[in-house]
UniProtKB/Swiss-Prot annotation:
Group of enzyme by EC: transferase
Gene designation: coaE
InterPro entries membership: Depp_CoAkinase, P-loop_NTPase
Protein name in UniProt: Dephospho-CoA kinase
Pfam families: CoaE (PF01121)
Length: 197
């Protein structure tokens, strides 16, 4: 049973592909959701953020995400400090969840890790699945979904790994510009092939 790391840039279809894997009986984990959990109220991650950045980044004992996002968007050293807090906590929690899921003997496990290319392949990932699409399609999808101006989406894209960098770490590439049913068949084929290896 393999653990796949699923990654792709903003607007690449990560949520859709995760759902397609779930439709095939494959449990999935979301690193972003785990990141939210490790900084929830009364969690050690939140206390560490308060120690590092100050209580101005908390509102009623909870993380003020908008304020922290603004800081790290404009300050590379603050972003690095936040990642130094979050990444070990996210990795530890993800490993715990994977071990729990393995006891159920699923066909595979998929962990959505948006920043996998930037942060490196974690030890618990056997193979990396990269979602690929043309940059113009990516931009259109992200603008439509997030209802943000093109300039804001472009800024996010520029902070992420490039398409070439993502493709360089890929063990498997899924083209998310194709019709949903074709993508579903690609996932079924991938699972069938890898179950027999």
């Amino acid at each position: 049973m393999k653990v796949y790391g699923l990654t792709g840039g903003i607007g690449s279809g990560k949520t859709t592909v995760r759902q397609l894997f779930e439709d095939e009986g494959v449990p999935t984990l979301d690193a972003d959701q785990i990141a939210r959990e490790v900084v929830a109220k009364n969690q050690p991650g939140l206390a560490e953020i308060e120690r590092t950045f100050g209580s101005d980044y908390l509102t009623n004992g909870e993380l003020n995400r908008a304020k922290l996002r603004e800081l790290i968007f404009n300050d590379a050293s603050a972003k690095q400090a936040l990642e130094a807090i979050l990444h070990p906590l996210i990795r530890q929690r993800t490993e715990q969840l994977i071990q729990q899921l393995k006891k159920q003997h699923p066909p595979a496990i998929v962990v959505e890790i948006p920043l996998l290319t930037e942060t490196g392949k974690p030890n618990y990932v056997d193979e990396v699945i990269v979602l690929d699409l043309a940059p113009e399609t990516q931009l259109k999808r992200a603008i439509t979904r997030d209802q943000l101006p093109a300039e804001d989406i472009q800024k996010i894209i520029q902070q992420q790994a490039t398409r070439a960098e993502r493709l360089a770490v890929a063990d498997i590439i899924l083209n998310t510009e194709q019709p949903l049913e074709t993508l579903r068949k690609d996932i079924q084929s991938l699972l069938h092939t890898h179950q027999n290896t």
